[in-house]
Amino acid sequence: MRCVKQVLILAVLLLMPCLVQAGYLTPDLQAKLDQTSPNDKLKVIVRMAEEADISVFPQGQWEAMVQYLKDFAAISQTDLLATLPRYGNKVSQIKPFWIYNGIAMEATKDVVLNLLRRPDVGCIEEKGIIKIEPLPGKKEPRVNGLEWNIARIQADRVWRELGYTGRGIVVGNIDTGVNVNHPTFGGRWRGGSNSWFDPINHQSYPYDDNGHGTHTMGIACGGSTADSIGVAPGATFVATKAFDASGNVEVDACMQWYAGLGSAAPNIISNSWGVIGNSTHYWQITRNLQILGIHQVYANGNSGPDSGTVGYPASYPHHIGVGGTTTSDTLASWSSRGPSPYFGAIESSANYLDPVWASSRRKPDLTAPGLNVRSAWYDTTYRVLSSTSMSAPHVAGVMALMLEKNPNLTDPQIWQILTSTCDTFSWGGPYPNQNYGWGRLNAYRAVLATPPSGVDEEAARSPVSRLPFSVRPNPFTSFFAVPGHETECFSLYDISGRRVGTYRGDRIGEGLQAGVYFVRAAKGDQKPLRVVKVR
């Protein structure tokens, strides 16, 4: 029966979509092989020639997508996994993955070259080393007040004036762990086996033996509205340990764990790590997480001030990359700059957040405070650190505020709102550019520009909802069509609430600069239609 079942599954999978790539060694691994003695083993990742494509599944079909990824990987890796034991002690630490179709292992040079000749192998790359080292800082006591960075992005205005703190939203991280008992978190770790993963030391309860992970999570959702170091103090969180002090990395395992959580997966994963270069290793992994409905944000890196220093995955066009600013809103000297490396035509540019990224390769997408940021440490103290590692969780926190207001936001919508509501300055322009992106994060403007959840349903209950006009394509466009209703009155407001024009007919918004605007439609003495956001 098992044989029949495998044949049937294989027959089905052969009809399912997949991505195919030709076999090659990455340049970094080729250089390393040239310097490796015959008996030494290298940490490598063998990518299969075919990759499952879950983008064709209907949105929200998480269980079917994950099962397809697992089945596709299991069947396509079967023959290779059966072959590896023949190499004896030349191969060890074999670990198959399904979040991408590949196998991590330690192997000698001759084994690597032999595997490359297989028709089912598409690429072999070196498993990278990422060191997350705590930056020098001074321990400081808790201060009863706002930190400069929280006030700078106006997160406190979101709590006070708009009433959003991230409540009901779950933030995850891929970092050095988190001390969930730190007083700043106030019991907001979600708890349970689906809220912590440690592929490094396999501990069952969260911990952080470094400090970096606790610090970054504190920025995203630490503290409270009365005494806050965090942007979204009402959010809960889950955590993983992907790094240790020796540079061992288990990012792939953490991403796969998140993908397997299903309805328990976090809304957002904050990533304060990256690798210099133009590798596409995380491309399919992060795309799969995105398709599964998990929002992600990545630190741009700390290799500035030269251009072209942005690390990956922040450099990928389907995710948000964040640079770092100082207390005076200038770009930090160490903040990595664009442009991104050229990755080739890996997939349709329709999946890119920035519509013109293919030509501009612009990164970062935006910046956030990264210098002298005070947050929680791995014990019960606080520490001031500087890095784009500190910048990225600011954006993750703002995303939590936005998602509390509207949990149905898509990645393109989030990107559009964040970039169109940034603060820009007389220096560093014109914007957007390869240093600041679209500008510095503004939490208040971003949440204000976020359309409330269920706006269509509320509009349907309004007397004016019978006006049959639509925004095409919804929700972001430079125009919208109002067929057959030239007599309606439309008022447009900018992000500050200032009315910028009143229109009749079919030239609504004509002459306005690109940006986010609010539209109110009225007819006669009827009540205005609920605010609709367009670009």
Regions found by a protein language model. Name each.
Residues A314-E404, N408, R445:
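Extracellular S/T/G-rich loop segment that most often corresponds to the catalytic His/Ser-adjacent loop
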Residues F237, W257-H281, A299:
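Short acidic, glycine-rich surface-loop motifs adjacent to enzyme active sites
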Residues A22-G23, L33, S37-N39, S92, ...:
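Subtilisin-like serine protease catalytic core
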Residues N114-V170, H182-T184, L331-F343:
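Protease zymogen maturation seam
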Residues E458-R535:
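C-terminal outer-membrane/trafficking sorting elements
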